[in-house]
Structures are given as C-alpha cells and as structure tokens.
Amino acid sequence: EKYGGNIKGFVATDCDDKKSITQLKRKIVEELQAMESLKARFPRRWFAIKDALSQMKAEHISFEDYRTLCQKNGESDPASQTSLAGFLHDLGIALNYGLGNRGQDQRLRFNYVLKPEWVTQGIYALLHAFVRKKGVFTRAEAVSELAKKDYSPEDTHFILELMELFELSFPLDDRHNRVLIPELLADQQPKDAASFKPAECLNFGYKYPVLTEGLLPRFIARTHHLGRAETRWKSGVILKDPSTGCSALVRADAAEAEVRVHIDGPQEGRRELLGIIRFNFDVIHSDYEFKPEAQVYPPAAPQKALAVDELEALARSKATTVSVVLPDKTVIDQDIATLIDPLATRPPLKLFLSYSHQDENFINELRKDLKLMQMNGLVYPWHDRNITAGEQWEPSILEELNAADMVICQLSRNYFASDYCIAELKAAIQRKLAGEAELVAYVLTDCGWKEFPGLSKFQLLPTDGKPLSDWNDSNKYWRAVIEGIQKAVKKFQAERKIRPARGTLDM
C-alpha cells in the first residue's frame, strides 16, 4: 500500500538456492525491458549536453545557465530542455528537485545540483552546528554557519528548501525564518512526561495504517507556540495552554502505528486544548490519502482503545453504555456520553477578509496576527487570493462571503474607491442586520467611513475607528485591531452551539 503501483511483484529468494537468484535476475530483466523510458531514443545533441554538464567543475548551476548550455549545444526548444532535465535528474547527472511533481516549492526548480555531495556536506554541517540548540535555529544562523564552508546565502537557502522538501526540517513560522530539525531532538522523553497519569487524564488518540516519519515533527512544528525546547523529543511533545491551564502529552508509537494524547488540568479547559490538538492533526491528515481511526481510552482502562466512530454509532442506536474488558478479564460498563462528550468541538469560524488589493500589504499584516488563532482552530480566514487558477473568481467570492461566519473589512480610501469592495461591505451589513453573520471593520486610513449608509451604527476598530496614521507605534495599532477581533470571535464562539464529536474535524 505504501508504494502503490511501483511494486511489480514478489520473488522469494534464498542465498543458498541459486535458482531463486536466477529467477530474481530474470524478473528484473523482464521489468526493465517493459519500461517505456528505456526504449526512448535521444537526439545526439542531448548526449553533448550531458557530457558538458558532467565536465563542469561547479557544484550547481542556475536554471538560466542550464538553458544557455542547452542552446549552445543545439537544443533551443524549452519543452525539450525540460524533458531532458527530467532524464538528467533520473540519471543523477543534474539533480532538479522542482521538476514536475517532485516538489511543490518551485524555488527549487531554479537550481541544478551537479555534485550531490555538495548538498550532503551542507546538510551535515547544519546538523553538526545546531546539536546544542536541539535542532531549532534561524535562517540567518544557518547562513552564518555555512558561510564557514564557503556556501553563499543563496546556497544556504536552497539547501534549507531541499531539507524541507524531504522533511528533514520543518518551518516554525509562516516566513520559514525559524527551522526545526527533528533528527536533533532528544531521543528520550523528559521527566515531565511521567507526571501524566492516564487514569486522571482525558485520553485520545489516532490509529494509522502506517505511521509516517514526518507526521509528529509536523505536529511539533505547527504547535511550537505551546511547547518548549526541553519538552520536545523525537517521538513526542508536551504542550501547555496558558489560557486554560491545561497540559497535554502527545506521544507517537511507531511500532503500534498510533499517536496518543493525554490531557490534564482543569476539566473545563481540556476540551479546548484537545480541539487545538485535533485541528492541527486534521490539517496534517488532509495531506494523506488514508484517514486514521480516532480513538478514546477510558480513564478506568487507559490501555483499552475504543473507536470513536463505533461509540457514536452506539449512541445513535440509543445505547448508553459500552462494555470494556480489563486485562484481568473483568468486564466494566462505561458511560458512552462521558467518553465522547469531551470530544465535541466548536468548528473554526469562517472569516471573509474584505480589502482593496492596493492595500494588500496591510491585510497581510492582519493575516500574520490571525495565524495563531488559526493554528488554535478558532478561525479559518479566507480572502480572494485563495481562489485557485481556472476558478471563476466572482461567483467564488460571493459564495465565500455568504458562507462566512464573520466578515472583516479593512476600510481605507482605496476600499471606498472600489465598486467590488463597496458591494462586499453592503452585503456584509445586510447579513449582520439579518443575524446571519458578524461584521468587524477596522479603519486603515482616513476615508470618511461615517458617511457610508448604515456603517455608523457599528463600533469600528481600533479605538473609535482611529486610523493607522494617528498611531505613534504601528505595532500597537495592529495589537488593538487583533484584540478587537479576538474579543468578537470569543463572543461569537460563546454563543455558538458545540458540535457533536466526530472522528475527523471538518476543514
């Protein structure tokens, strides 16, 4: 299942049995002869390009240099150049990790590695340099370290992108300025992990067909704001949520292909912290073809896994208890509602960001401040840059606006000069008055917003609609805006119904 169609068959072999080895060789030859790529005929000029690349002394060349080399050797067609690049990559002559589906980050496409050991040496230099920092460092620190090995800043950034592509490292922030290398985390869990007593905790977990190596490091990176360096290790992390006073032990077991979560602290805060944990795992799970099975572990029998889907099915059939067999063969009945009620969550609020494209750099500042709320599963911001290529943008915007729980408008002179923005604002006011959505607006520049019909009835952010230009410190302005939004989100969520438990949260 892991390798899909790449597995062509299985051949039983025994080193003492020459016939089985002969059979294996025959099978390999048969599969090689069936490969269409081996039958391809290459133009003579492609061999000249291959030889030229092999003779170069540089560690890597740029995309443009590669194209120039192709043209000098008679290959001027861009499509043929790209096709040849794919073959050169497969042959290990000029590696390009951004071609086709080899990498999502197209920045990798602009470098051809001619000496693989150059990449390997750079990676090992970073591993050695940041052992004492337990694998957490900044890009600037990486640039400084690799400069000692004659790597340019551009070379360092390329190697970091390559490490991220192969999940050797993970970003700790949106701008990828802070980096985590899981391989440098401690092998052993900290002593604090022993303080979690499953019999006294809210216990939850996931069962996987196979536990991928990158899953837990991605989770650690996504929830780094709730963890500390000394409470992270290769197979787990301890999180602490200051807003609820609760802590969580999240630990992976590769042999059992499962992740277990134990949450202690005030009862009323456990559900909220579990919601944050589940939200971040669901974001990660959305990248996988398989879906893990959500499980709960009764405090009275913390080693006994009960599938959430099965408990929900029992609850729908009006069953009130489920029988659990203990290790000593004793059978106890557990209340189903007690097991699944703590899993109920409030879905993240869908935010629609309404702004003028001329003020896009300012809306990006807001998105940075919303990121923490998004990672905590409180909000899901949407703006028109989310529209995918080929999608009709006007119907998509209208659909998202009508589906939003809260519309956030960035008011400015540019905003009121746009017919599209005005239409969005009118629709937002109508939905607010109809009780269909919340409206939050903040004033970016002096724009005469009080003259807009119906808008003067609302309290605008920040304090009394004071524009950015009237603040001595822009950071204080954005802090006032985000605190106002947080207050509105908290009020909206408090009035919202809790959603019943489900194995996977909706994204």
What are the residue ranges of the model-derived segments?
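Conserved N-terminal substructure of TIR/SEFIR domains
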Residues: L343-Q410, I429-E438, L444-C447, K476-M507
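Glycine-rich, charge-decorated loop segments at or immediately adjacent to ligand/cofactor-binding or catalytic sites
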Residues: C447-P462
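Extended, non-catalytic interaction/assembly segments in eukaryotic proteins
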Residues: E1-T345
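Short acidic, S/G/P-rich loop/turn micro-motifs used as interaction or catalytic elements
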Residues: D17-K19, G265-R270, Q358-N361, I387-T388, ...
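Short beta-alpha junction loops
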Residues: V296-A301, R413-N414, Y442-K450
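Conserved beta-strand scaffold positions in the cores of enzyme catalytic domains, especially
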Residues: G9-A12, P381, L439-A441, L460, ...
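Conserved TIR/SEFIR loop-to-helix hotspot centered on a Trp-containing motif
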Residues: R413-A434
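C-terminal helix of von Willebrand factor
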Residues: D16-Q33, D470-Q493
